[in-house]
A protein has these predicted regions:
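Short alpha-helical transmembrane segments in multi-pass integral membrane proteins
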Residues: 1-28, 86-151, 195-251, 307-372, ...
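Helix-terminus/linker motif at the lipid-water interface of multi-pass membrane proteins
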Residues: 36, 40-59, 128-135, 191-198, ...
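Small-residue-rich hydrophobic transmembrane alpha-helices
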Residues: 58-118, 155-174, 268, 281-345, ...
Protein backbone atom coordinates (compact mmCIF):
# COMPACT_ATOMS: atom_id res chain seq x y z
CA UNK A 1 0.00 0.00 0.00
CA UNK A 2 2.97 2.34 0.48
CA UNK A 3 4.04 2.27 -3.18
CA UNK A 4 1.45 4.69 -4.61
CA UNK A 5 2.39 7.41 -2.13
CA UNK A 6 5.25 8.80 -4.18
CA UNK A 7 3.25 9.56 -7.36
CA UNK A 8 0.58 11.14 -5.16
CA UNK A 9 3.08 13.62 -3.77
CA UNK A 10 4.27 14.57 -7.22
CA UNK A 11 0.73 15.36 -8.35
CA UNK A 12 -0.47 17.12 -5.18
CA UNK A 13 1.01 20.26 -3.63
CA UNK A 14 0.32 19.94 0.08
CA UNK A 15 0.83 23.31 1.75
CA UNK A 16 0.62 22.04 5.32
CA UNK A 17 4.37 22.27 5.96
CA UNK A 18 7.44 24.19 4.85
CA UNK A 19 7.83 27.86 3.91
CA UNK A 20 4.47 29.63 3.79
CA UNK A 21 5.39 32.26 1.22
CA UNK A 22 7.08 29.72 -1.05
CA UNK A 23 4.07 27.40 -0.90
CA UNK A 24 1.68 30.23 -1.72
CA UNK A 25 3.95 31.55 -4.48
CA UNK A 26 4.37 28.10 -6.06
CA UNK A 27 0.61 27.76 -6.14
CA UNK A 28 -0.26 31.36 -7.05
CA UNK A 29 2.18 32.12 -9.87
CA UNK A 30 0.90 29.46 -12.29
CA UNK A 31 -2.67 30.43 -11.43
CA UNK A 32 -1.98 34.13 -12.00
CA UNK A 33 -0.16 33.43 -15.25
CA UNK A 34 -3.08 31.29 -16.37
CA UNK A 35 -5.61 33.98 -15.53
CA UNK A 36 -3.51 36.67 -17.19
CA UNK A 37 -3.24 34.45 -20.23
CA UNK A 38 -7.01 33.98 -20.24
CA UNK A 39 -7.51 37.72 -19.94
CA UNK A 40 -5.00 38.26 -22.72
CA UNK A 41 -7.05 36.18 -25.11
CA UNK A 42 -10.27 37.86 -23.91
CA UNK A 43 -8.61 41.19 -24.61
CA UNK A 44 -7.36 39.99 -27.99
CA UNK A 45 -10.93 38.90 -28.69
CA UNK A 46 -12.19 42.44 -28.01
CA UNK A 47 -9.34 44.03 -29.99
CA UNK A 48 -10.20 41.86 -32.99
CA UNK A 49 -13.92 42.61 -32.63
CA UNK A 50 -13.33 46.35 -32.20
CA UNK A 51 -10.93 46.67 -35.12
CA UNK A 52 -12.69 44.38 -37.62
CA UNK A 53 -16.35 44.85 -36.65
CA UNK A 54 -16.47 48.36 -35.15
CA UNK A 55 -17.45 50.00 -31.87
CA UNK A 56 -21.08 48.81 -31.92
CA UNK A 57 -19.98 45.17 -32.10
CA UNK A 58 -17.47 45.83 -29.31
CA UNK A 59 -20.30 47.31 -27.24
CA UNK A 60 -22.51 44.29 -27.98
CA UNK A 61 -19.94 41.73 -26.86
CA UNK A 62 -18.89 43.80 -23.85
CA UNK A 63 -22.42 44.50 -22.61
CA UNK A 64 -23.22 40.77 -22.72
CA UNK A 65 -20.66 40.08 -20.00
CA UNK A 66 -22.75 41.22 -17.02
CA UNK A 67 -25.87 39.16 -17.85
CA UNK A 68 -23.70 36.14 -18.68
CA UNK A 69 -21.98 36.31 -15.28
CA UNK A 70 -25.36 36.84 -13.64
CA UNK A 71 -26.53 33.47 -14.96
CA UNK A 72 -23.33 31.45 -14.47
CA UNK A 73 -22.36 32.98 -11.11
CA UNK A 74 -24.10 30.30 -9.07
CA UNK A 75 -22.15 27.49 -10.75
CA UNK A 76 -18.89 29.31 -10.04
CA UNK A 77 -19.84 29.56 -6.38
CA UNK A 78 -20.57 25.85 -6.22
CA UNK A 79 -17.14 25.21 -7.78
CA UNK A 80 -15.58 27.22 -4.95
CA UNK A 81 -17.47 25.11 -2.42
CA UNK A 82 -16.29 21.93 -4.10
CA UNK A 83 -12.69 23.17 -4.07
CA UNK A 84 -12.88 23.90 -0.34
CA UNK A 85 -14.25 20.44 0.41
CA UNK A 86 -11.65 18.66 -1.76
CA UNK A 87 -8.77 20.70 -0.32
CA UNK A 88 -9.83 19.90 3.25
CA UNK A 89 -10.02 16.15 2.56
CA UNK A 90 -6.64 16.25 0.80
CA UNK A 91 -5.19 18.13 3.78
CA UNK A 92 -6.63 15.49 6.11
CA UNK A 93 -5.28 12.75 3.74
CA UNK A 94 -8.73 11.11 3.57
CA UNK A 95 -8.60 9.21 0.27
CA UNK A 96 -12.15 7.83 0.38
CA UNK A 97 -13.84 11.17 1.02
CA UNK A 98 -11.63 12.87 -1.58
CA UNK A 99 -12.82 10.33 -4.18
CA UNK A 100 -16.47 10.92 -3.35
CA UNK A 101 -16.07 14.71 -3.30
CA UNK A 102 -14.34 14.82 -6.70
CA UNK A 103 -16.93 12.70 -8.50
CA UNK A 104 -19.88 14.42 -6.86
CA UNK A 105 -18.43 17.80 -7.89
CA UNK A 106 -18.23 16.81 -11.55
CA UNK A 107 -21.77 15.39 -11.49
CA UNK A 108 -23.06 18.68 -10.08
CA UNK A 109 -21.17 20.57 -12.81
CA UNK A 110 -22.82 18.58 -15.60
CA UNK A 111 -26.30 19.13 -14.16
CA UNK A 112 -25.75 22.87 -13.67
CA UNK A 113 -24.21 23.21 -17.13
CA UNK A 114 -27.25 21.67 -18.83
CA UNK A 115 -29.63 23.89 -16.86
CA UNK A 116 -27.64 26.99 -17.79
CA UNK A 117 -27.57 26.03 -21.47
CA UNK A 118 -31.36 25.89 -21.72
CA UNK A 119 -32.04 28.81 -19.38
CA UNK A 120 -29.41 31.12 -20.82
CA UNK A 121 -30.60 30.72 -24.41
CA UNK A 122 -34.22 31.24 -23.32
CA UNK A 123 -33.75 34.53 -21.45
CA UNK A 124 -30.98 36.22 -23.48
CA UNK A 125 -33.13 38.67 -25.44
CA UNK A 126 -35.44 39.54 -22.55
CA UNK A 127 -32.51 40.24 -20.23
CA UNK A 128 -30.74 42.49 -22.73
CA UNK A 129 -33.94 44.43 -23.50
CA UNK A 130 -34.53 44.90 -19.76
CA UNK A 131 -30.99 46.34 -19.51
CA UNK A 132 -31.91 49.16 -21.94
CA UNK A 133 -29.47 47.89 -24.57
CA UNK A 134 -29.61 50.35 -27.51
CA UNK A 135 -31.33 49.08 -30.65
CA UNK A 136 -28.18 49.40 -32.76
CA UNK A 137 -26.38 47.03 -30.38
CA UNK A 138 -29.20 44.66 -29.34
CA UNK A 139 -29.18 42.27 -32.31
CA UNK A 140 -25.48 41.44 -32.05
CA UNK A 141 -25.67 41.20 -28.25
CA UNK A 142 -28.51 38.65 -28.43
CA UNK A 143 -26.64 36.61 -31.03
CA UNK A 144 -23.48 36.55 -28.93
CA UNK A 145 -25.28 35.59 -25.70
CA UNK A 146 -27.30 32.76 -27.25
CA UNK A 147 -24.27 31.22 -28.93
CA UNK A 148 -22.20 31.61 -25.77
CA UNK A 149 -24.75 29.69 -23.72
CA UNK A 150 -24.80 27.01 -26.41
CA UNK A 151 -21.35 26.00 -25.15
CA UNK A 152 -21.59 27.01 -21.49
CA UNK A 153 -21.59 23.35 -20.35
CA UNK A 154 -17.92 23.10 -21.32
CA UNK A 155 -17.10 26.19 -19.26
CA UNK A 156 -18.93 24.95 -16.15
CA UNK A 157 -17.29 21.51 -16.26
CA UNK A 158 -13.86 23.03 -16.87
CA UNK A 159 -14.25 25.43 -13.93
CA UNK A 160 -15.12 22.51 -11.67
CA UNK A 161 -12.19 20.43 -12.97
CA UNK A 162 -9.84 23.38 -12.51
CA UNK A 163 -11.18 23.82 -8.99
CA UNK A 164 -10.27 20.21 -8.21
CA UNK A 165 -6.77 20.69 -9.64
CA UNK A 166 -6.31 23.91 -7.67
CA UNK A 167 -7.54 22.24 -4.47
CA UNK A 168 -4.75 19.71 -4.97
CA UNK A 169 -2.24 22.53 -5.46
CA UNK A 170 -1.79 21.50 -9.10
CA UNK A 171 -2.42 24.95 -10.58
CA UNK A 172 0.24 24.47 -13.29
CA UNK A 173 -2.15 22.24 -15.18
CA UNK A 174 -4.75 25.02 -15.23
CA UNK A 175 -2.18 27.30 -16.86
CA UNK A 176 -1.34 24.73 -19.51
CA UNK A 177 -4.97 24.16 -20.45
CA UNK A 178 -5.76 27.87 -20.45
CA UNK A 179 -2.79 28.40 -22.76
CA UNK A 180 -4.19 25.84 -25.19
CA UNK A 181 -7.64 27.44 -24.98
CA UNK A 182 -6.18 30.92 -25.44
CA UNK A 183 -4.23 30.01 -28.56
CA UNK A 184 -7.27 28.21 -29.98
CA UNK A 185 -9.52 31.21 -29.30
CA UNK A 186 -7.22 33.78 -30.90
CA UNK A 187 -6.67 31.66 -34.02
CA UNK A 188 -10.39 31.01 -34.39
CA UNK A 189 -11.19 34.70 -33.85
CA UNK A 190 -8.93 35.63 -36.76
CA UNK A 191 -10.32 32.84 -38.95
CA UNK A 192 -14.02 33.32 -38.15
CA UNK A 193 -14.13 37.13 -37.76
CA UNK A 194 -11.37 38.46 -40.02
CA UNK A 195 -11.37 35.59 -42.52
CA UNK A 196 -14.90 34.18 -42.81
CA UNK A 197 -16.63 37.46 -41.82
CA UNK A 198 -18.95 35.76 -39.32
CA UNK A 199 -19.30 38.83 -37.11
CA UNK A 200 -20.02 38.51 -33.40
CA UNK A 201 -21.27 34.97 -34.03
CA UNK A 202 -17.70 34.05 -34.92
CA UNK A 203 -16.46 35.50 -31.63
CA UNK A 204 -18.98 33.44 -29.63
CA UNK A 205 -18.25 30.23 -31.54
CA UNK A 206 -14.50 30.73 -31.05
CA UNK A 207 -15.10 31.09 -27.30
CA UNK A 208 -17.23 27.93 -27.17
CA UNK A 209 -14.64 25.84 -29.00
CA UNK A 210 -11.79 27.11 -26.83
CA UNK A 211 -13.78 26.22 -23.71
CA UNK A 212 -14.36 22.74 -25.11
CA UNK A 213 -10.59 22.35 -25.56
CA UNK A 214 -9.81 23.29 -21.94
CA UNK A 215 -12.65 21.07 -20.68
CA UNK A 216 -11.46 17.99 -22.56
CA UNK A 217 -7.81 18.48 -21.61
CA UNK A 218 -8.54 18.93 -17.90
CA UNK A 219 -10.83 15.90 -17.75
CA UNK A 220 -8.28 13.82 -19.63
CA UNK A 221 -5.61 14.67 -17.05
CA UNK A 222 -7.92 13.95 -14.12
CA UNK A 223 -8.69 10.54 -15.62
CA UNK A 224 -5.00 9.67 -15.98
CA UNK A 225 -3.43 11.17 -12.85
CA UNK A 226 -2.13 8.76 -10.20
CA UNK A 227 -3.50 10.58 -7.17
CA UNK A 228 -6.38 10.52 -4.70
CA UNK A 229 -8.37 12.90 -6.88
CA UNK A 230 -8.23 10.68 -9.99
CA UNK A 231 -11.49 10.67 -11.95
CA UNK A 232 -13.29 7.55 -13.16
CA UNK A 233 -16.13 8.31 -15.58
CA UNK A 234 -18.25 5.45 -14.25
CA UNK A 235 -18.02 6.91 -10.73
CA UNK A 236 -19.33 10.38 -11.65
CA UNK A 237 -22.59 10.60 -9.77
CA UNK A 238 -23.94 12.87 -7.03
CA UNK A 239 -23.55 11.47 -3.52
CA UNK A 240 -26.37 12.91 -1.41
CA UNK A 241 -24.29 13.55 1.70
CA UNK A 242 -21.39 15.08 -0.24
CA UNK A 243 -23.71 17.13 -2.45
CA UNK A 244 -25.25 18.59 0.68
CA UNK A 245 -21.83 19.57 2.06
CA UNK A 246 -20.61 21.08 -1.23
CA UNK A 247 -23.83 23.05 -1.70
CA UNK A 248 -23.82 24.20 1.92
CA UNK A 249 -20.35 25.70 1.47
CA UNK A 250 -20.81 26.79 -2.15
CA UNK A 251 -24.38 28.13 -1.90
CA UNK A 252 -23.47 31.39 -0.12
CA UNK A 253 -20.73 32.09 -2.67
CA UNK A 254 -23.09 31.17 -5.52
CA UNK A 255 -25.80 33.48 -4.23
CA UNK A 256 -23.17 36.15 -3.63
CA UNK A 257 -21.94 35.85 -7.23
CA UNK A 258 -25.44 36.09 -8.67
CA UNK A 259 -26.52 39.03 -6.55
CA UNK A 260 -23.29 40.94 -7.18
CA UNK A 261 -23.65 40.17 -10.88
CA UNK A 262 -27.19 41.55 -10.69
CA UNK A 263 -25.78 44.80 -9.32
CA UNK A 264 -23.29 44.80 -12.20
CA UNK A 265 -26.22 44.37 -14.59
CA UNK A 266 -27.74 47.51 -13.07
CA UNK A 267 -24.40 49.29 -13.48
CA UNK A 268 -24.22 48.14 -17.11
CA UNK A 269 -27.77 49.42 -17.64
CA UNK A 270 -26.64 52.81 -16.33
CA UNK A 271 -23.67 52.78 -18.72
CA UNK A 272 -26.00 51.81 -21.59
CA UNK A 273 -28.01 54.98 -21.01
CA UNK A 274 -24.97 57.04 -22.07
CA UNK A 275 -24.99 55.50 -25.57
CA UNK A 276 -22.98 53.09 -27.71
CA UNK A 277 -19.68 55.01 -27.40
CA UNK A 278 -19.82 54.87 -23.60
CA UNK A 279 -20.69 51.16 -23.78
CA UNK A 280 -17.74 50.47 -26.07
CA UNK A 281 -15.32 52.49 -23.93
CA UNK A 282 -16.48 50.80 -20.74
CA UNK A 283 -16.34 47.37 -22.41
CA UNK A 284 -12.79 48.00 -23.62
CA UNK A 285 -11.61 49.15 -20.21
CA UNK A 286 -13.25 46.20 -18.45
CA UNK A 287 -10.95 43.95 -20.48
CA UNK A 288 -7.99 45.90 -19.08
CA UNK A 289 -9.62 45.75 -15.65
CA UNK A 290 -9.31 41.98 -15.80
CA UNK A 291 -5.51 42.21 -15.64
CA UNK A 292 -5.97 43.48 -12.08
CA UNK A 293 -9.12 41.62 -11.04
CA UNK A 294 -8.13 38.10 -12.11
CA UNK A 295 -4.78 38.04 -10.26
CA UNK A 296 -6.62 39.36 -7.19
CA UNK A 297 -9.06 36.44 -7.43
CA UNK A 298 -6.09 34.11 -8.01
CA UNK A 299 -4.53 35.20 -4.73
CA UNK A 300 -7.93 34.80 -3.10
CA UNK A 301 -8.12 31.23 -4.43
CA UNK A 302 -4.59 30.62 -3.15
CA UNK A 303 -5.71 31.80 0.29
CA UNK A 304 -8.76 29.51 0.13
CA UNK A 305 -6.68 26.47 -0.85
CA UNK A 306 -3.86 27.18 1.62
CA UNK A 307 -6.28 27.77 4.48
CA UNK A 308 -8.43 24.80 3.44
CA UNK A 309 -5.52 22.36 3.55
CA UNK A 310 -4.10 23.71 6.81
CA UNK A 311 -7.50 23.98 8.45
CA UNK A 312 -8.17 20.37 7.46
CA UNK A 313 -4.83 19.39 9.01
CA UNK A 314 -5.45 21.48 12.15
CA UNK A 315 -2.55 23.91 11.55
CA UNK A 316 -4.29 27.06 12.76
CA UNK A 317 -1.13 29.16 13.12
CA UNK A 318 -0.34 28.60 9.43
CA UNK A 319 -3.93 29.54 8.60
CA UNK A 320 -3.49 33.04 10.05
CA UNK A 321 0.03 33.57 8.70
CA UNK A 322 -1.00 32.33 5.26
CA UNK A 323 -3.80 34.88 5.06
CA UNK A 324 -1.43 37.79 5.76
CA UNK A 325 1.22 36.57 3.32
CA UNK A 326 -1.33 36.15 0.54
CA UNK A 327 -2.87 39.52 1.29
CA UNK A 328 0.51 41.26 1.11
CA UNK A 329 1.31 39.69 -2.26
CA UNK A 330 -2.06 40.68 -3.70
CA UNK A 331 -1.87 44.30 -2.53
CA UNK A 332 1.68 44.70 -3.87
CA UNK A 333 0.62 43.34 -7.27
CA UNK A 334 -2.29 45.77 -7.61
CA UNK A 335 -0.17 48.78 -6.65
CA UNK A 336 2.35 47.92 -9.38
CA UNK A 337 -0.14 47.16 -12.15
CA UNK A 338 -2.38 50.11 -11.32
CA UNK A 339 0.58 52.46 -11.72
CA UNK A 340 1.63 50.90 -15.04
CA UNK A 341 -1.87 51.05 -16.51
CA UNK A 342 -2.23 54.72 -15.65
CA UNK A 343 1.16 55.48 -17.20
CA UNK A 344 0.21 53.91 -20.54
CA UNK A 345 -3.54 54.55 -20.63
CA UNK A 346 -3.74 56.22 -24.06
CA UNK A 347 -1.82 53.66 -26.14
CA UNK A 348 -3.61 50.84 -24.31
CA UNK A 349 -7.08 52.18 -25.14
CA UNK A 350 -6.11 52.84 -28.75
CA UNK A 351 -5.45 49.13 -29.19
CA UNK A 352 -9.22 48.60 -29.16
CA UNK A 353 -10.40 51.42 -31.40
CA UNK A 354 -9.40 54.62 -33.17
CA UNK A 355 -12.63 56.34 -32.09
CA UNK A 356 -11.46 59.14 -29.79
CA UNK A 357 -14.82 59.36 -28.00
CA UNK A 358 -14.63 55.69 -27.07
CA UNK A 359 -11.00 56.11 -25.97
CA UNK A 360 -11.95 59.06 -23.76
CA UNK A 361 -14.61 57.02 -21.94
CA UNK A 362 -12.11 54.20 -21.36
CA UNK A 363 -9.39 56.51 -20.02
CA UNK A 364 -11.90 58.17 -17.71
CA UNK A 365 -12.75 54.78 -16.19
CA UNK A 366 -9.06 54.04 -15.74
CA UNK A 367 -8.54 57.20 -13.66
CA UNK A 368 -11.17 56.10 -11.15
CA UNK A 369 -10.28 52.39 -10.99
CA UNK A 370 -6.51 51.99 -11.11
CA UNK A 371 -5.38 53.84 -7.95
CA UNK A 372 -7.73 51.84 -5.74
CA UNK A 373 -7.35 48.17 -6.70
CA UNK A 374 -5.46 47.55 -3.45
CA UNK A 375 -8.81 47.92 -1.65
CA UNK A 376 -10.28 45.11 -3.74
CA UNK A 377 -7.18 43.00 -3.04
CA UNK A 378 -7.71 43.48 0.69
CA UNK A 379 -11.38 42.54 0.45
CA UNK A 380 -10.92 39.39 -1.62
CA UNK A 381 -7.74 38.24 0.16
CA UNK A 382 -9.45 38.13 3.54
CA UNK A 383 -12.67 36.71 2.10
CA UNK A 384 -10.74 33.87 0.42
CA UNK A 385 -8.98 32.96 3.66
CA UNK A 386 -12.20 32.87 5.68
CA UNK A 387 -13.89 30.83 2.95
CA UNK A 388 -11.12 28.21 3.19
CA UNK A 389 -12.35 27.20 6.66
CA UNK A 390 -15.77 26.42 5.20
CA UNK A 391 -17.29 29.60 6.65
CA UNK A 392 -18.58 31.08 3.42
CA UNK A 393 -21.54 32.99 4.88
CA UNK A 394 -19.60 35.93 6.44
CA UNK A 395 -17.73 36.76 3.20
CA UNK A 396 -21.03 36.46 1.34
CA UNK A 397 -22.72 38.94 3.66
CA UNK A 398 -19.86 41.44 3.40
CA UNK A 399 -19.69 41.19 -0.39
CA UNK A 400 -23.46 41.47 -0.77
CA UNK A 401 -23.56 44.60 1.38
CA UNK A 402 -20.61 46.33 -0.30
CA UNK A 403 -20.72 45.14 -3.91
CA UNK A 404 -24.48 44.78 -4.30
CA UNK A 405 -26.73 46.58 -1.83
CA UNK A 406 -24.50 49.64 -1.63
CA UNK A 407 -24.22 49.83 -5.44
CA UNK A 408 -27.99 49.56 -5.89
CA UNK A 409 -28.53 52.37 -3.38
CA UNK A 410 -25.85 54.46 -5.11
CA UNK A 411 -27.42 53.99 -8.55
CA UNK A 412 -30.88 54.87 -7.30
CA UNK A 413 -30.12 57.80 -4.99
CA UNK A 414 -26.58 59.13 -5.59
CA UNK A 415 -26.00 58.72 -9.34
CA UNK A 416 -28.69 61.28 -10.31
CA UNK A 417 -26.55 64.00 -8.67
CA UNK A 418 -23.73 63.39 -11.19
CA UNK A 419 -23.89 65.09 -14.57
CA UNK A 420 -21.87 62.43 -16.41
CA UNK A 421 -20.74 58.81 -16.39
CA UNK A 422 -18.13 59.58 -13.72
CA UNK A 423 -20.83 58.85 -11.14
CA UNK A 424 -20.84 55.24 -12.34
CA UNK A 425 -17.06 54.95 -12.28
CA UNK A 426 -16.53 56.36 -8.78
CA UNK A 427 -19.04 53.85 -7.43
CA UNK A 428 -16.48 51.04 -7.79
CA UNK A 429 -13.64 52.25 -5.51
CA UNK A 430 -16.12 53.50 -2.90
CA UNK A 431 -17.80 50.07 -2.74
CA UNK A 432 -14.38 48.36 -2.56
CA UNK A 433 -13.41 50.54 0.39
CA UNK A 434 -16.62 49.68 2.24
CA UNK A 435 -16.09 45.95 1.64
CA UNK A 436 -12.44 46.04 2.72
CA UNK A 437 -13.33 47.73 6.01
CA UNK A 438 -16.18 45.32 6.79
CA UNK A 439 -14.12 42.23 5.89
CA UNK A 440 -11.16 43.44 7.96
CA UNK A 441 -13.39 43.98 10.99
CA UNK A 442 -14.60 40.38 10.75
CA UNK A 443 -11.22 38.80 9.93
CA UNK A 444 -9.39 40.55 12.76
CA UNK A 445 -11.82 39.09 15.31
CA UNK A 446 -10.23 35.69 14.65
CA UNK A 447 -13.27 33.56 15.57
CA UNK A 448 -13.33 32.09 12.05
CA UNK A 449 -10.01 30.32 12.79
CA UNK A 450 -11.53 28.17 15.53
CA UNK A 451 -10.75 24.55 14.68
CA UNK A 452 -13.80 22.43 14.10
CA UNK A 453 -14.47 19.87 11.39
CA UNK A 454 -17.94 20.27 9.94
Amino acid sequence: MAAPAQPQQKKTLLMTEGSIWKSILLFSVPLILGNLLQQLYNTADSIIVGNFLGSNALAAVGSSGSPIYLLIGFSQGVAVGAGVVVSQYLGAKDKKETHIAVHTSLAIAVILGLILTVGGIAVSRSLLVWMNTPEEVLGDAVTYMKLYFGGVLFSVVYNMAAGILNAAGNSRRSVLYLACASITNIILDLVLIAGLKMGVAGAAIATDISQLVSCVLSLRFLMKVDADYKVELSAIRPDQRMTSRIIRIGLPTGIQNMVISFSNVLVQSSVNSYGAAAMAGFAAYMKIDGFNILPVTSFSMAATTFVGQNYGAGNLKRVKNGMWVTLGMSVLYTLCTGTLLLAFQNPIMHLFTSDETVVAFGCSAMHYFCPFYFLLATLHGMAGAVRGTGRSVPPMVVLLISLCLFRVVWIQFVLPFFAGIEGVFILYPVSWALGAVLMALYAWKGSWMTYEHS
